[in-house]
Amino acid sequence: MSFSAETKDELARIEEGKRCCNLAELAALVRMDGTLQIANHSYALNVITESAPVARKVYRLAKNLLGLPVDIMVRRKLRLKKNNSYMVKIYPRTLEDLQQLGLLDEEGEILPGIPNVLVKKKCDRIAYLRGAFLAGGSINNPEGTYHLEIITNDSLHAEALSKLLNKFHLGAKVSMRKSWHVVYIKESEHIVEFLGFIGAHRALLEFENVRVLKDMRNQVNRLVNCETANLNKTVDAAVRQVENIQRVANTIGLQALPEPLREIAELRLEYPDASLKELGEMLVPKVGKSGVNHRMRKIDELAEKLEEQSKRVRKGG
C-alpha cells in the first residue's frame, strides 16, 4: 500500500465526532466524489471511490447522521492490478437533505464553492478538509519530493479549498492539470501541520521520521562535499607550491633564499602532502598556519618573477 493510501486508510478510520463536524466531512466527500441525480421529484447521490474504508465512512455518515436510506455496491475490475471501485448510493428524501449537505440553495440551485454554514467553526473547517483529502487528495512518499494535493473539477471549489487551507497558513496554491484544478502544498512543514490537524498522526510520524533522516543525509553530504572541496584546494595548493619551489631551485638555487623561505621550501619538498599547519609545527621555533602561508606566497611571487624573466630571455634570444 502506498504512503498516500495508508494515510487515507488512517483518516477513514477516525471515529465520528460532533454532528457539525460529521456533516462538514460528509459534505466534502459528497461534493468531491458524488453525482446528483434528480428524476420525478426524487433524488439520488452516487458517491464513487476506490477506497473501501472511505466507502464505509460515507455509508456510516449518511445513514447515522442524516438517517437516509443508503446502498453500497462493489464494481470489480477484471484487469490485473486495478482496484475495485465502490459506489455508495444515498437517497435524500427532501430538498432540505441536500441543503444540509451544502449542495443546493433554497431555490434548488447548485451552490458554488463551500457554503459558509458548513465551515463556521474551526472543527468544521478541519473536518471539511479531511473529507476533501479523503475524496480527492494524495500525498507523495516523503522519500521523494514533498507534495500534497487535492484535485477537483470545479474551479470555484478549488479556490474555496485553497482559502480554507490558508486560514491555517499552509501556503496552498492552485494550478491546472489538464481539465482538473489542483490545490497543492509543497513545504514539508506545512504538510506536517496539515496531517496533524486532520488527524493523520501515524502518517505524520512516518513523514517526520523520513524527513529527519533525509535532512541528516543531506547535511552529511554537504559536509563531505565541503571537506572534499577543501581537500582538493589543499592538494592543488601543495602541487603549485612544489612546482614553484622546484622552479626557484632550478633557476637560482634554494641557497639563494632567505633562511625562513629556504626552511619552509625544503620542508615542502620533503613533505608534499603535509598541511600548512603541519609544516609550521615542524619548524624550530614553530610557526602558525598564517606565517607558513605568508612564506609560501613569497616563494610563489619569486617563482612568478623568475618565470617572467625566463620568458623575456627566450624572446630576446
Swiss-Prot record:
Keywords: Cell cycle, Cell division, DNA-binding. Disulfide bonds: none annotated. InterPro entries: Homing_endonucl, Sporu_reg_WhiA_N_dom, Sporulation_regulator_WhiA, Sporulation_regulator_WhiA_C, WhiA_LAGLIDADG_dom. GO terms for biological process: cell division; regulation of sporulation. Pfam families: HTH_WhiA, LAGLIDADG_WhiA, WhiA_N. Residues 275-308 bind DNA. One of its GO terms (molecular function) is DNA binding. Belongs to the WhiA family. HAMAP family: HTH_type_WhiA. PANTHER family: CELL DIVISION PROTEIN WHIA-RELATED (PTHR37307:SF1). This is Probable cell division protein WhiA. It comes from Desulfitobacterium hafniense (strain Y51).
